[in-house]
């Protein structure tokens, strides 16, 4: 783990002393896990009655953020909370529904490229606007400074700060 001055979205983080209290570490982890679980359950309802499942939304989130709305299948899989075979089956169902296309990756003979169709992108944007409002409502209890700190801390835990 890195120590010292690190930076987050709000600038440098103060010097991080090594963790010494294992009980506090476990309590913090359990609290983070419970918060994530509760928020995830709440957010899941954002997709009730929409044209996309949460998993389909997650695929389109990765794909629409990529250049030319095209991402490698392994990038999509890396952003999902399900296994690679499950992602592959999900993408195949999305192809059948006309939400994405899938083709061989010319730069990687074993890989595939996933591209959002116009229909998939339109549906994604419509749901994304509502989903973003829902997330903002859930996060409104935190100040901008707390949100920046939360972002920095979770990035640090993911080791990509």
Give the ranges of each region predicted by the language model.
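Charged, amphipathic alpha-helical coiled-coil/dimerization segments
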Residues: 40, 92-155
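Short, charged, intrinsically disordered terminal tails
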Residues: 159-160
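Short, locally clustered residues in the helix-turn-helix/winged-helix DNA-binding domain
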Residues: 33, 61-68, 128, 155
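N-terminal helix-turn-helix DNA-binding core of bacterial DNA-binding proteins
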Residues: 41-83
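N-terminal leader segment of winged-helix/HTH proteins
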Residues: 1-50, 97-99
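Alpha-helical hairpin
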Residues: 21-24, 52-54, 116, 142
């Amino acid at each position: 783990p890195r120590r010292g001055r690190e930076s987050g979205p709000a600038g440098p983080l103060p010097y991080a002393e090594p963790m010494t209290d294992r009980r506090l570490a476990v309590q913090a982890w359990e609290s983070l896990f419970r918060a994530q679980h509760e928020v995830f359950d709440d957010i899941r309802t954002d997709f009730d009655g929409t044209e996309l499942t949460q998993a389909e939304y997650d695929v389109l989130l990765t794909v629409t953020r990529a250049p030319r709305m095209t991402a490698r299948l392994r990038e999509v899989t890396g952003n999902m909370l399900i296994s690679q075979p499950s992602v592959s089956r999900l993408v195949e169902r999305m192809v059948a529904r006309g939400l994405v296309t899938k083709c061989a990756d010319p730069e990687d003979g074993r890989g595939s490229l996933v591209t959002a169709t116009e229909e998939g992108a339109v549906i994604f944007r419509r749901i994304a606007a509502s989903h973003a409002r829902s997330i903002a409502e859930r996060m409104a209890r935190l100040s901008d400074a707390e949100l920046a700190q939360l972002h920095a801390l979770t990035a640090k835990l993911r080791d990509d700060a």
